Amino acid sequence: MPKDRSKPLPVILFRTPYNNDEDRFIDLCIFFAQQGYIAVAQDLRGRYDSEGQFYPWVNEYNDGYDTIEWLGSQPWCDGSVGMIGRSYVGNVQWQAATISSSYLKAIVPRVIGDDLYRSPHYQGSASRLG
C-alpha cells in the first residue's frame, strides 16, 4: 500500500498461478504503490499460499469476481479495481470481466492466448458475457 493512506485509493489486482511471492509480482506491487495505487497479488485457488484445488480455468470466473467484489468494497478502496498481467494472469482478466462487477474499471491483458475460437472464455470467436 502507498505510504499516504489518508483517502481510499484504486486497486490494481494480479491473480496468478505463478506464485505471488516471486520478485516480479513484488516489484510490480511496489511500483504501483509508488504511483498511488493499492496493489494486490493473489495466488489462484490451490496454488502456493491459496487453499483448495487448482483446476485450470475452472474457478477463475467466480473466484475473480469474488476477489474484485471484496477488494472494491473495502474502506481503503475507492471503488475502482483494475487488473493487469500477461499469459495466464492476462487470460483470467477476461474471465473475471465476463461476470460484471461494478468495481472492475479496466483490464490490461497482455500476451494472452491467440486461439479465440477454442479459448476457455470465448465460444465460436464471440466473447462469453454471461
What do these predicted regions represent?
Residues 23, 81, 117:
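Short acidic, gly/pro-rich beta-turn/loop elements at beta-sheet edges
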Residues 59-70, 74-76, 81-83, 93, ...:
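Active-site-proximal cofactor/substrate-binding loop regions of enzyme domains
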Residues 11-14, 38-42, 80-85, 105-111:
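Structural recognition of the beta-strand scaffold that forms the well-ordered cores
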Residues 3-72, 120-122, 128:
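Cap/lid segment of the alpha/beta-hydrolase catalytic domain
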Residues 84, 88-130:
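A catalytic-pocket lid/entrance helix-loop region that shapes and gates access to the active site
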